[in-house]
């Protein structure tokens, strides 16, 4: 067991055969996430009593992490597109014993009128090209095409359109991807600011000081594997006006 970068509670575990052989995992004492994914809950900075909607939540790591940061107060509505994905979230809820996360099936591209301005925080960790995790999934680069890139950007914007409607006035929207593609990251940020009543807000008060940089002062963080020793990952923090 080694200390992982940036977060004191993040550990790197090695020299084991399978995650299911670890008692700490089976007992729900640990949850598997890259440090980059852990930074989503850090950037969201939920307060006790917050209502959070996690729109693309499976397998539930970010939802459970956000719930843990609130203790037993507040709640997380963890959604994904299929029953299979909702069941993955439920499996992790059961294993970790969290009591304030509820999993359900909800297509993130389909408007849910019951969620209109309902959330203090919305997490939109959207489907992406995955260019930030090619080191773990090298097959991604053989499947990439310009057409697929355009299609994924359209999907992301459909989800962001719904996410924008679910945040309360003065609430927080976290937009994240596991890619390094500008089309899916910075260009989506510019598109979103142009079309919705939001402003970027710096995540610096909530993330480790080592990660503070010019872009985080503006409101977003791009992690690069060769520099940050994490997955390639993008996080933007928006405040609804």
What are these regions (language model features)?
Residues 1-241:
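S-adenosylmethionine
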């Amino acid at each position: 067991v080694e200390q992982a970068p940036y977060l004191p509670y993040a550990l790197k575990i090695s020299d084991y055969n399978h995650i299911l052989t670890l008692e700490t995992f089976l007992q729900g004492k640990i949850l598997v996430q890259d440090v980059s994914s852990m930074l989503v809950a850090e950037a969201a900075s939920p307060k006790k009593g917050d209502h959070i909607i996690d729109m693309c939540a499976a397998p539930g790591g970010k939802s459970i992490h956000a719930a843990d940061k609130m203790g037993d107060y507040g709640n997380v509505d963890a959604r994904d597109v299929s029953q299979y994905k909702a069941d993955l979230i439920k499996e992790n809820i059961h294993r970790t014993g969290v009591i304030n996360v509820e999993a359900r099936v909800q297509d993130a591209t389909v408007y849910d009128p019951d969620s209109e301005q309902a959330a203090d925080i919305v997490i939109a960790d959207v489907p992406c090209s995955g260019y930030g995790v090619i080191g773990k999934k090298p097959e991604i680069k053989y499947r990439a095409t310009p057409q697929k890139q355009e299609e994924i950007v359209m999907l992301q914007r459909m989800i962001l359109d719904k996410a924008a409607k679910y945040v309360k006035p003065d609430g927080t929207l976290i937009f994240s991807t596991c890619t390094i593609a500008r089309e899916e990251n910075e260009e989506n940020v510019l598109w979103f600011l142009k079309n919705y009543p939001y402003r970027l807000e710096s995540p610096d008060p909530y993330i480790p000081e080592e990660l503070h940089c010019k872009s985080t002062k503006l409101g977003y963080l791009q992690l690069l594997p060769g520099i940050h020793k994490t997955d390639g990952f993008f996080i933007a923090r928006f405040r609804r006006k």
